[in-house]
Every structure is written in C-alpha cells, then in structure tokens.
Amino acid sequence: MSEFLPFSRPAMGSEELAAVEEVLRSGWITTGPKNQQLEQAFCRLTGNRHAIAVCSATAGMHVALMALGIGPGDEVITPSLTWVSTLNMIALLGATPVMIDVDRDTLMVTPELIEAAITERTRAIVPVHYAGAPADIDAVHALGKRHGIAVIDDAAHAAGTYYRGRHVGESGTAIFSFHAIKNMSCAEGGMIVTDDDALADRMRSLKFHGLGVDAFDRQTHGRAPQAEVLTPGYKYNLADINAAIALVQLDKLAAHNARREQIAQRYLSELADTPFLPLARPAWPHQHAWHLFILRVDRESCGLSRDELMQQLKEQGIGTGLHFRAAHTQKYYRDRFPQLSLPETEWNSERICSIPLFPGMSDGDCDRVIAALRTLAER
C-alpha cells in the first residue's frame, strides 16, 4: 500500500526551523519581539489597528467574550455547525449559546436566521467563516449595528480569505487560528484583530493575568517592574517560538493558499460528474482560502454513507476529516437543548466529509484521491 495520505499536513520547511533556532539562541523564548513583529505583520494583512496574539483561537474567543462583558443571563448567537470551543466558552462564562441553522449549500449563517434568533438578551453574534469562504459580512455587521449587538467573526478558517476585496476581520473584531491544520500554523496559536481601542486594551490585559503590561513591555518601555493587576485574567499569551514560526508561515500564506486553490479546482472539475456534493460558493464577491474541501455523501445518491466512505478511503491509505458534528448533537448540549431542531445543520452534519487538501500535496496525491473517489462512486 502507498504511504498514508492524511487529510492535512503542516507545510513546514527550513525557514521555520531557522526561525525557531534564532529564537532559542536569542535567550528570549516566551512572549517578546517575535510576538510584536507578528502582530504588526497581521495588522498589515487584515488592515486592522490592533492584533493580539494568543495561544489559541479558543483563548481568543474566551477573552473577546469576557472583554465584552458576556455573562449569566446573556445570549450569544452562533451556528451549531462549528467546532465546540465557541459554545464551550459561551457556556463557561455562564451565558446561553443560541445555536442557529445554516444555509444548506454553503453552510453559512444568514442574516435572516440570525435576526430570527435575536431577543432582548442577545449580547453578541458569532458568525463562522466556514472552510475558507466568508459569510455575508456586511449584512451580518449591519444587523448587529441596527440592534446594538456586538459581532465577533469566527475567522479560524479564514487566513487569506477576502470579502468584497477586504480581508476578513477588517470590518470589526475577528479571531484567527494557527492550529496545526490551518492555512498558516505555528502548532498552536491564534490572533484577535480589532479596531476598537478600548476592547483591544481589555483583551490584552485579560490574556495575560489581567496585568496592564507584560514582561517584554516592561523591559522595552522602561515601565515599573511591578505590574498591576487590573482585573483577574488568564495566561493565554503566545510564546516567541510559536510566533517566529507564524511569521514565516504568514510570508508563505499567499503561495500556500494558491496551491490549495489549484487542488480544490482539480477536485471540483474531476469529481463534478460523481454524486459526491461539494459546497456551493457564496454569491457575494470573495476570495476563497480553501482551508477545507468538503464533500456531502448521501447514501441515497452515493450508494454508501459518509462513515462508510471514510472507512473505505482509510483502508486505501487516504485520510479524511469531519468538520463538524453539529454541536447541539453533542451530549452536553443535547441534554440542555433537547428540543432544538436545525434541519439543514443536521442533514449536513451526517454527510459532510473533508478530503485531503494541503499545500504539500503532489499532483500524484491528488490523482490518488480523485481515483479512489471515482472508484467508490462507480460501485
């Protein structure tokens, strides 16, 4: 059998190794100059005034919600078809996650579905820019503004995603992920961007013990050695080892996303006559980052279930992923929201499958995936 082909693999090279070595030799391996450089570079990418590096996008979501004052009695609207970390952060703050349905074909939240879920207790909306494509940012943000509700864009899949010529995040506050499978990675990490000065100050403090400054800030700006706690906070800072990797990855992002686009276009072209159903592209002008390539596998039209297809591909040495099982079907949320019915989410959650897509894939790897899927489609 051929070597196992995972559905994703980090695209790391000699430049990342050299960047890590530089940090290790510098003597400053935790939050320091590389974080500062990364934040500045990310602001240039998205066009925001502030970028705040954190140890994960989950940490970023936590401090963003905290900085907005989200707590008991509040409601936060977000899709169920997302990674559970967003729901978990809402729940851990004592607030109520209001899970809504998505468009059946794009898997995006819509302004209509969001507005139908708004109540007098709604404090925030968290739209998900899914698989590398953007939700309808202008419409969602206009809705939030009209109702006086904060919007936090879940841009974990959206490094290099553009909406109407603007990078996702430019319009407000957004959270990106640098997890191992993301378009740019530093193993674990994330970035919050915002143009809200006061919100940025609160998030910076909350991510580092609730202090007004961190150790590097004190050293470089000559501030008092005894930093003051402004509010109880967390230790969500990013180490410079990770930031150095992320800086290199950011430089490679455009090239990596271009390769992802090439692979995705091959899949779209060469699987078009199979019963496996890809996601529809959003109607608004955008540049897709192709974080994931999703197929929907319906037993009635495909002759096998999603789980059976994933097993068949695994037996042929091809990895797949599931992004995501609907959050409201997970035990914790199922027990708390037993009557919740989201038909489009549930239909997709039972059928979605992520097939291999990463910049290090060769043309031969693509051939192998396409051939395996075509064979399964013909059975």
Curated annotation (Swiss-Prot):
Q: What does this protein do?
A: Catalyzes the conversion of UDP-4-keto-arabinose (UDP-Ara4O) to UDP-4-amino-4-deoxy-L-arabinose (UDP-L-Ara4N). The modified arabinose is attached to lipid A and is required for resistance to polymyxin and cationic antimicrobial peptides.
Q: Which reaction does it catalyse?
A: UDP-4-amino-4-deoxy-beta-L-arabinose + 2-oxoglutarate = UDP-beta-L-threo-pentopyranos-4-ulose + L-glutamate
Supply the name of the protein.
UDP-4-amino-4-deoxy-L-arabinose--oxoglutarate aminotransferase
Q: Has the keyword Lipid metabolism been applied to this entry?
A: yes
Q: What class of enzyme is it?
A: transferase
Query: Pathway, per UniProt?
Result: Nucleotide-sugar biosynthesis; UDP-4-deoxy-4-formamido-beta-L-arabinose biosynthesis; UDP-4-deoxy-4-formamido-beta-L-arabinose from UDP-alpha-D-glucuronate: step 2/3; Bacterial outer membrane biogenesis; lipopolysaccharide biosynthesis
Write down the Gene3D superfamilies for this protein, in alphabetical order: Aspartate Aminotransferase, domain 1 (3.90.1150.10), Type I PLP-dependent aspartate aminotransferase-like (Major domain) (3.40.640.10)
Q: Does the keyword Transferase apply?
A: yes
Signal peptide region: none
What is the organism of origin for this protein?
Erwinia tasmaniensis (strain DSM 17950 / CFBP 7177 / CIP 109463 / NCPPB 4357 / Et1/99)
User: InterPro entries, alphabetically?
Assistant: ArnB_NH2Trfase, DegT/StrS_aminotransferase, PyrdxlP-dep_Trfase, PyrdxlP-dep_Trfase_major, PyrdxlP-dep_Trfase_small
Q: Which GO terms describe its biological process?
A: lipid A biosynthetic process; lipopolysaccharide biosynthetic process; response to antibiotic
- Keywords annotated in UniProt: Aminotransferase, Antibiotic resistance, Lipid A biosynthesis, Lipid biosynthesis, Lipid metabolism, Lipopolysaccharide biosynthesis, Pyridoxal phosphate, Transferase
Q: Which residues carry this modification: N6-(pyridoxal phosphate)lysine?
A: K182
Q: Its Gene Ontology molecular function terms?
A: pyridoxal phosphate binding; UDP-4-amino-4-deoxy-L-arabinose aminotransferase
What is the protein's quaternary organization? Homodimer.
Q: What EC number(s) has UniProt assigned to this enzyme?
A: 2.6.1.87
Which SUPFAM superfamilies does this one have? PLP-dependent transferases (SSF53383)
- Identify its protein family: Belongs to the DegT/DnrJ/EryC1 family. ArnB subfamily.
One cellular component term (GO) for this entry is: membrane
Which cofactors is this protein said to need?
pyridoxal 5'-phosphate
